């Protein structure tokens, strides 16, 4: 995956073109897939994108008779062989990323491929048109400011349970805490924001959380309801907060833990937002603004 300083654009599997395959859809917050969908491909994947690279994440093939490689063609260049990671063993992982490409419009065709696709990540370039896109911000991004002493970073794979392929969270890490008073803040220029994490269905107790968006508070509680039949010990892509539609412009989201009991945790994986700027040159540098304000206050 690209570096944390890059701007990543999320491309979910329904936004891709396949020559042959099928798509599974699950109810919200019940499975492991971004957007609650994934696609199993037996043929070609064709993508046109504007940026400097693209990567694909999903399950590699379970079948021992399926090819352990595929052909990757980029623009007018000759296709080349790519081997799946962990060939012979089914894993949920980033199974392909293009080399870094010149900023611009690119065509990628992955052929003779049998694989599962959950999502793709495009690294935006200066010429990438961002209107209508979804920016994804990893939990390790410097744009997220963590407060409190209880935060811990984890890079362990998520255990999804029988019938599912375990795998890493987006960006391979999460931030977790159960300390009252811990929180984070994030500033963005956009028209909608969502917060996603990992939920532990085998944990006990509760974590109560306040999300404050531009001064308006939304309270929620993370807990496992009584008599719940646990299907997944943990799940990825659990929606922790959604703003709904906002006026396009600059916004501030603050999260704060107000109560915690038992061993339940707040686990942050990533944020997504719809930008209100059209190109990277128009993206505000809130990190620099916060740093300048801090120096002025000293």
Protein language model features and the residues they cover:
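Glycan-recognition surfaces in beta-rich domains, encompassing non-catalytic CBMs
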Residues: 1-296
């Amino acid at each position: 995956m690209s570096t944390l300083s890059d701007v990543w654009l999320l491309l979910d599997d329904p936004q891709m073109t396949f020559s042959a395959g099928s798509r599974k859809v699950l109810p919200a917050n019940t499975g492991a897939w971004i957007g609650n969908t994934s696609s199993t491909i037996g043929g070609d994947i064709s993508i046109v994108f504007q940026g400097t690279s693209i990567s694909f994440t999903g399950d590699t093939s379970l079948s021992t008779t399926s090819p352990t490689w595929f052909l990757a063609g980029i623009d007018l260049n000759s296709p080349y062989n790519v081997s799946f990671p962990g060939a012979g063993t089914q894993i949920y992982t980033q199974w392909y990323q293009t080399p870094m490409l010149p900023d611009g419009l690119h065509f990628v065709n992955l052929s003779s491929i049998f694989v599962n696709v959950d999502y793709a990540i495009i690294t935006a370039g200066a010429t990438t048109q961002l209107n209508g896109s979804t920016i994804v911000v990893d939990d390790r991004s410097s744009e997220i400011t963590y407060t409190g002493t209880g935060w811990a970073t984890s890079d362990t794979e998520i255990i999804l349970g029988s019938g599912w392929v375990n795998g890493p969270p987006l960006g391979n890490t999460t931030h977790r805490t159960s300390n009252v008073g811990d929180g984070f803040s994030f500033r963005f220029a956009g028209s909608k924001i969502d917060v996603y994490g990992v939920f532990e269905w085998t944990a006990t107790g509760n974590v109560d959380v306040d999300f404050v968006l531009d001064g308006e508070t939304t309270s929620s509680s993370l807990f496992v309801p009584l008599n719940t039949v646990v299907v997944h010990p943990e799940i990825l892509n659990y929606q922790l907060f959604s703003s709904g539609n906002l006026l396009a412009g600059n916004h501030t989201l603050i999260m704060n833990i107000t109560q915690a009991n038992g061993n339940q945790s707040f686990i942050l994986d990533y944020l997504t937002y719809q930008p209100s700027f059209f190109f990277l040159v128009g993206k505000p540098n809130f990190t620099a603004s916060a740093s300048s304000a801090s120096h002025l206050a000293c």
